[in-house]
């Protein structure tokens, strides 16, 4: 992996991780365009730079993270469903992750769903709740389990979950960001621990990992601010059309037998 490739992948990670557009789908397209082949270090790199994205949430919402213990208890309750389902379905999840057809199909279907989300939950903006209860947090965590299917988008699943519990778009999006911290931290830490031998053997590539995290951190902060602004003003429809276009593009490329891989 070159320095330029690491920067571009980190930018893609930072932009897409917290938007309801599926970071996995974008990594597939980006890697195909740049000719990046799947290898052990590339997989470790894409996992490791998620730490930078996670940190951006903590920095942006610093006061919320250190406000009260109740905040952490709610995140813990919301994290429980994902932890349980993740442990039970790990082998199946690993298999799904290798299937680009699954990613393309879920991108397309998820995009169609997003086209109707604003209409379904229109009253939330005037009558919705701003505070997340324990029950709401748990149910959002259940929705997050859907994101284990590649292409669904963790952000899209959890925000829609929040909307079903009568949260405003902003409140649902922010709790989605908060829930990403324990969820992504646990998944990333576990993946890196499993690859600890490879990391120890690749000390010469540590600068690439550090650069990737810095870039992902900066870009993710900007993406979160952009997303909240767009979401509160215009809703989900634009993201829906974008997902449909991306999913269709992936399906066309697959039909043309273009070599696409989940790197």
From Swiss-Prot:
It comes from the Bacteria. The chain crosses the membrane at residues 1-21, 41-61, 69-89, 97-117, 132-152, 172-192, 208-228, 238-258. Its EC number is 3.6.1.27. It is found in: Cell inner membrane. It is a multi-pass membrane protein. One of its GO terms (cellular component) is plasma membrane. Keywords: Antibiotic resistance, Cell inner membrane, Cell membrane, Cell shape, Cell wall biogenesis/degradation, Hydrolase, Membrane, Peptidoglycan synthesis, Transmembrane, Transmembrane helix. InterPro entries: UppP (IPR003824). Pfam families: BacA (PF02673). It catalyses: di-trans,octa-cis-undecaprenyl diphosphate + H2O = di-trans,octa-cis-undecaprenyl phosphate + phosphate + H(+). One of its GO terms (biological process) is regulation of cell shape. GO terms for molecular function: undecaprenyl-diphosphatase activity. Belongs to the UppP family. Bacitracin is thought to be involved in the inhibition of peptidoglycan synthesis by sequestering undecaprenyl diphosphate, thereby reducing the pool of lipid carrier available. Catalyzes the dephosphorylation of undecaprenyl diphosphate (UPP). Confers resistance to bacitracin. This is Undecaprenyl-diphosphatase. It comes from Cytophaga hutchinsonii (strain ATCC 33406 / DSM 1761 / CIP 103989 / NBRC 15051 / NCIMB 9469 / D465). The lineage of its organism: Bacteria, Pseudomonadati, Bacteroidota, Cytophagia, Cytophagales.
């Amino acid at each position: 992996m070159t320095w330029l490739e690491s920067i571009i992948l980190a930018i893609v990670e930072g932009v897409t991780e917290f938007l309801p557009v599926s970071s996995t789908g974008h990594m597939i397209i980006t890697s195909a365009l740049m000719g990046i082949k799947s290898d052990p270090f590339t997989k470790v790199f894409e996992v490791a730079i998620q730490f930078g994205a996670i940190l951006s949430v903590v920095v942006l919402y610093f006061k919320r993270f250190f406000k009260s213990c109740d905040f952490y208890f709610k995140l813990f309750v919301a994290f429980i469903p994902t932890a349980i389902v993740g442990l039970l379905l790990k082998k199946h999840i690993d298999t799904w992750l290798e299937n680009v057809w699954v990613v393309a199909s879920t991108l397309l279907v998820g995009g169609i769903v997003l086209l109707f989300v604003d209409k379904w939950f229109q009253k939330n903006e005037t009558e919705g709740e701003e505070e997340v209860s324990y029950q709401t947090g748990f149910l959002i965590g259940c929705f997050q389990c859907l994101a284990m299917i590649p292409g669904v988008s963790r952000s899209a699943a959890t925000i829609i979950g929040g909307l079903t519990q009568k949260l405003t778009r902003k409140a649902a999006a922010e709790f989605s960001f908060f829930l990403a911290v324990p969820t992504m931290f646990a998944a990333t830490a576990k993946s890196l621990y499993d690859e600890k031998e490879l990391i120890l053997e690749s000390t010469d590539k540590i600068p690439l990992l550090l650069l990737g995290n810095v870039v992902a951190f900066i870009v993710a902060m900007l993406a979160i601010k952009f997303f909240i602004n767009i979401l509160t003003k215009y809703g989900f429809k634009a993201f829906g059309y974008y997902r449909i276009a991306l999913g269709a593009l992936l399906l066309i490329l697959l039909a043309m037998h273009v070599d696409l891989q989940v790197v």
